[in-house]
Structure formats: structure tokens, C-alpha cells
Amino acid sequence: MTNYYGHNIVIIGLGITGITCVNFFRSRGITPRVMDTRYNPPQLNQLPKDIQYWLGELKIEWLLAATLIVISPGISLSHPAINTAMKCGIEIIGDVELFLREVTVPVVAITGTNGKSTVAKLVGTMANCAGLKVGVGGNIGYPVLSLLQQSHQLYVLELSSFQLETTKNLKVAVATILNISEDHMDRYPLGLQQYREAKLKIYKQAKIYIINDDDKLTLPANSTNKEYCSIIKFGIKSGHYCLGDYQGKQWLMAYGKPLLDCNEIKIIGRHNLLNALAALALAEAIAIPRQACLIALRQFSGLMHRFELVLERKGIRWINDSKATNVGSTKAALNELTVDGTLHLLLGGDGKLADFSSLQPFVQGNNIHLYCFGKDSKKLAALNQHSATITQTLSQAMHIINNQVKAGDVVLLSPACSSLDQFENFKVRGKTFTNLVFEFNDGNNN
């Protein structure tokens, strides 16, 4: 356990992550100070009464007096006040760094633009099926410091690029970058390579690398240094874990041998088969028995808001892919669809300065109509001007679709954007979609 006695600690951010940091230090007899750029941060009412706090801006005097600053992922290191503190030599870390300083059991670290939560949860399920006491947390929605409240034999962490930026001690058992495509360009003004470099930090001290053989951007610079690391690869057609034909069907393969008929897996889509392969590779790296992995794959039904079939009724499929907060994720969803009638595609939100142009080939044709809402609705509608409807809100778009949809059609919410311009998070956006689906189908569609 790291000793923070005598430190002047400032915590930046009073969301769920920030309040767990406050509780972490309080449990060790340390009273931190807290600040947030928001005037009404979500966890303000959870803050103990004796904790000093500052709202609306970052108080530079507190920062420069600190010996340790713990920053939440939502605050950029490029913020002028943070930059000033860094130049003064003040240590700035995140909650993941605090967590890793405390644990002594193996840690699985997972990042990537898309699929992180699914793979993290799947590896956790595999460990559970093997009888291991496993803690799953991080960017998946469960703060890592909360995992310390119970003892575990293994930790599985989903890590965002923002979390990796503020983590120094990444001595993990195994690490992977599932894929890399453009995302969060509002935080990475130098472009994709800057974003990629943040992701690549996950490999720095890992004992084993799990590499996506289909995505060369995920390849670490020292991957050929055999003395430094061990590598397991996964991919659609190549890698130690890949897809293959066996007895006339598509199977998950391991080292050229058939493992599991893909028809036995509940999660749908080619991208989820790739997620399953990645999970198997990670499980091998930490010696989870193969049989437990196969049981988990047969049981695992996926996570909400991720290419989730909400309802199929009267020949119409309604799919909630609200977690598609970037172009790459929406492209993956569109690759999975076979549509007999018309695809009604809901796009919109805050694109985070993304370039939408690579989405254009996916949204052409006579059997697709775009419904674009939110901050970047006009940019998205320009992808197919002849077949796009612009609305202010998701709800307005859904009501238009409900009056037009017919048997053979698919309604897909896969926004390619963040939800934060109009919703608290992607979950609320997905729930709004789902509620409208059932409202339509329990009412005027029955």
C-alpha cells in the first residue's frame, strides 16, 4: 500500500471517478481538496462536508500548492492550468495509477477504439466460469478504485486513451489494443497518430501482448523484441486465434484447430466474433482453462446498447447500437446488416471533430435513408444528401420513421457520435430509443 501521508492532494473532477478518489484518500487518513470546471458536478452532494472544493474553473493556487494532482479522464492534460502544474514538476496521475499501486494480483489491460467493454466483460465471465474471483472495472462504467473494496484473484480493466495518459505504472500481466480508428479528435488535435500513441502506452510494461493481426495500427514498436515480450495474435483470417471453416460451418479456431461453432455464440456480428477471439487470446495469456472459456462464450449474451436487437415484430427489426460513438463503430455495424427492405439509419450527436467521409460509401444506395439529429446533423446528412432527413432530436426522427417503416425494414440507431450534446450519456440515448420502440409497438403498431 502506497503511503500518501504528508502529501497535499488535489482531485480534479467530481463525477463518479472523482468521488471514488476522495473516498480512497479518506480511507487512508488523507483529506484532499477537490475542484471541477462545472458549477454543478454530478457527485457534489456525495462530497463529505469537511472537504474543501472549488467549482467553475481550476484554481491555479491550489494546483501549484499540491504535491500530487489526481485528474479525472474528462479533463484534458492540455488544459492551461494543468500544463502549468506539469511544468512546475507536480505529479499528475489518474485513478488507474492509484489502483495499480495497490494491487498485487494479475491485471488484464484492454483498450481500443471499439469493443473494449464487450471483451472486458467476456474475459471476466470466462474467469468466473473458471471459479476465479475477478474484478472488472475501468472505463466500462465501474471505477477501478471501487474494486479495492473486495479481494480478487484477477482484475480485468477497460482503459480509455485518457486513462492511459495519466497512468505510469502499467506492469500488467497482459495487454491488448483491440483496434484503432479515429475518435476523440477534439482531444487529439494532432490527429490519429497522437491518439494512437496514447493507446500504445498500454504495452509499455506488459508481459504479454495480444495483437490484432488485422489492424497494423495496434502493433507496438517493440513487437519484434522476443526477449521483451510474448505475443499472441488474433484476427478474422490469420493469427493464433481466427475464424475458419470446419464441417461446412464457420468456427472459432485456435492454432489451426476448431474450438467452437460460431452458431453456438449468442453475440451477433462479425465484429463480435473478433471480440470473442480477442477474449480467448487474453484468457490463454492468464491461463484460464479452455473449457471455462467455451462455457462463457455459449452463455454470454452481450452488453446493452451494443448492436442490441431490441425488438423484431411484424417483419421489422429495431437495433440499438447507441454505443457507436465513432465512425469505426458505425461502419462495423453496417457491415453486419442484411436488409430486405429499407435501412432507416439514425445518425447524430457530437462528432468530436471527426472526419465522417469514410462513412460515405456505407450509406449510399436506394434502400437506405438517413435520419440525422443533434449537433453534427448537417455534416452527417451531407453523406447522402438525396436520402437524408434532418431533425433536431432523436425522438423527432423516430416518430418520422414510425410512420414510414414496413415489413422487411431495419431501424438502426448507430450514431457515429458522442451523445453529450443532448443526453447525459450513450446509455440514456439508447434507453430513449428503446422506450420509443416499445411505445410504438405496444401502441399504434399493434
UniProtKB/Swiss-Prot annotation:
The keyword Cytoplasm applies. One of its GO terms (cellular component) is cytoplasm. It is an enzyme of class 6 (ligase). Its EC number is 6.3.2.9. It comes from the Bacteria. It catalyses: UDP-N-acetyl-alpha-D-muramoyl-L-alanine + D-glutamate + ATP = UDP-N-acetyl-alpha-D-muramoyl-L-alanyl-D-glutamate + ADP + phosphate + H(+). GO terms for molecular function: ATP binding; UDP-N-acetylmuramoylalanine-D-glutamate ligase activity. ATP binds at G112, T113, N114, G115, K116, S117, T118. Pathway: Cell wall biogenesis; peptidoglycan biosynthesis. HAMAP family: MurD. Cell wall formation. Catalyzes the addition of glutamate to the nucleotide precursor UDP-N-acetylmuramoyl-L-alanine (UMA). This is UDP-N-acetylmuramoylalanine--D-glutamate ligase. It comes from Baumannia cicadellinicola subsp. Homalodisca coagulata. The lineage of its organism: Bacteria, Pseudomonadati, Pseudomonadota, Gammaproteobacteria, Candidatus Palibaumannia.
